[in-house]
C-alpha cells in the first residue's frame, strides 16, 4: 500500500492565492478550503487509499521559543487564517484523517508519520505531498519520496542529492548554513548554496567540518572566510540546525490502516452544500474505520 501525507498548510496557502474569492452564505471566505477539499478528494478518486493531512492549527510552535525571528502568524491575511479550522472540520467530515498541530508543526507531523509508516512491511511507499525543502530530510531511497503535486515532480533520495547537492541526512545542516527565509532564520553570512553543498557533500554534518579550511579540499568560494564565520557563528549554526530538524518522535497513529479512507461522515453532505463542494459516495457503515476502543 502507498501512504499519502499531505501538507495542508501549504495547500491552503497555495489555493488561497491561486483562486478568486468565494464566500459562503455566512460571509466566510471559503475558496481555499474548497480548493484543498477538491484536491484531496481528487487524490482519493485517483486511487489513494491511505491519506492524512497535517495542518498548522496554530502557526507558532516550540521553535518560536528557540529563535525570536521564527515564523509567526503575523502578516497572514485574516481570511486565510480563518480557513484553517474550517479546512480541518471539512476534511474530517469528508472522512480524511487530519492532524491539527499546535506545539509542533505540520512538517513535524508529516516527518513522524513518514518514519512510522515506513516501518510497516505492508507499506510499499510513503509519499510526502509538499515541495517544502524541510521535508527533503525525510526522503529515504525510493521508499519515502517527496511529491510536488503542482509540478507533478516526484523526488527520491537520488533526486534530493541532485537538487540540493547533499544527502537527505545533511539537509538540516545545509539549511542551518544557507538559512530558510520562509521559516525566519538567516543562516550564516557568506555561506551560499553551492559552497554549503560542496562542504557538506564531503563532511555530512557541521561537527565533521574541519576548523582548518585547508583540510576541506572542496570547491568552495572564500573557504578561509567561511571557516572563520562557522567558528564565530557556531552556536547559531547549531541552533539553526535544531530549527531545521523535523521531529519524528510524535505518535500520531498505532496502525497505518487508521489512515485508510472509508468515506465521509453523515454530516459531510450538508457541510459540502454550504461550500458548494463536491459530494462523494459513502461506504457501508460496516467497513468504516475501527473505533479507538478496538485498537491494540
Protein language model regions, located:
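Low-complexity, acidic/Ser/Thr- and charged residue-rich accessory regions of DNA metabolism proteins
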Residues: 229-296
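Short alpha-helical interface elements
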Residues: 31-34, 38-41, 61, 65-68, ...
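Conserved beta-strand edge residues that scaffold enzyme active sites
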Residues: 57-58, 105, 286
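Extended two-metal-dependent nuclease catalytic cores across DNA- and RNA-processing enzymes
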Residues: 22, 73-254, 278
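Domain-level signal for Mg2+-assisted phosphodiester chemistry and nucleotide/NA-binding surfaces
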Residues: 1-95, 151, 258
Amino acid at each position: 500500500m502507498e501512504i499519502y501525507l499531505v501538507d495542508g498548510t501549504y495547500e491552503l496557502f497555495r489555493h488561497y492565492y491561486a483562486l478568486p474569492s468565494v464566500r459562503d452564505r455566512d460571509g466566510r471566505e471559503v475558496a481555499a478550503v474548497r480548493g484543498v477539499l477538491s484536491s484531496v478528494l481528487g487524490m482519493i478518486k485517483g486511487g489513494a487509499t491511505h491519506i492524512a493531512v497535517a495542518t498548522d492549527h496554530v502557526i507558532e510552535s516550540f521553535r518560536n521559543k528557540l529563535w525570536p525571528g521564527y515564523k509567526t502568524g503575523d502578516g497572514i491575511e485574516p481570511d486565510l487564517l480563518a480557513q484553517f479550522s474550517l479546512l480541518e472540520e471539512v476534511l474530517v467530515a469528508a472522512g480524511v484523517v487530519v492532524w491539527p498541530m499546535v506545539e509542533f508543526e505540520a512538517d513535524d507531523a508529516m516527518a513522524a508519520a513518514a518514519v512510522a509508516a515506513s516501518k510497516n512491511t505492508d507499506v510499499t511507499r510513503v509519499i510526502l505531498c509538499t515541495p517544502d525543502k524541510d521535508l527533503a530530510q525525510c526522503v529515504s531511497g525510493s521508499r519515502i519520496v517527496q511529491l510536488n503535486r503542482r509540478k507533478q515532480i516526484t523526488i527520491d533520495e537520488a533526486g534530493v542529492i541532485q537538487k540540493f547537492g547533499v544527502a537527505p541526512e545533511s539537509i538540516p545542516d545545509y539549511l542551518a548554513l544557507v538559512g530558510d527565509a520562509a521559516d525566519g532564520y538567516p543562516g550564516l553570512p557568506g555561506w551560499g548554496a553551492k559552497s554549503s553543498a560542496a562542504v557538506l557533500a564531503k563532511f555530512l554534518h557541521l561537527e565533521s567540518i574541519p576548523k582548518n579550511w585547508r583540510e576541506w579540499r572542496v570547491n568552495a568560494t572564500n573557504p578561509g572566510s567561511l571557516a572563520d564565520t562557522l567558528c564565530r557563528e557556531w552556536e547559531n549554526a547549531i541552533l539553526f540546525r535544531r530549527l531545521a530538524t523535523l521531529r519524528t518522535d510524535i505518535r500520531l497513529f498505532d496502525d497505518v490502516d487508521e489512515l485508510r479512507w472509508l468515506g465521509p461522515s453523515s454530516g459531510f453532505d450538508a457541510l459540502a452544500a454550504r461550500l458548494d463542494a463536491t459530494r462523494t459516495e459513502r461506504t457501508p457503515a460496516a467497513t468504516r474505520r475501527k473505533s479507538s476502543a478496538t485498537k491494540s
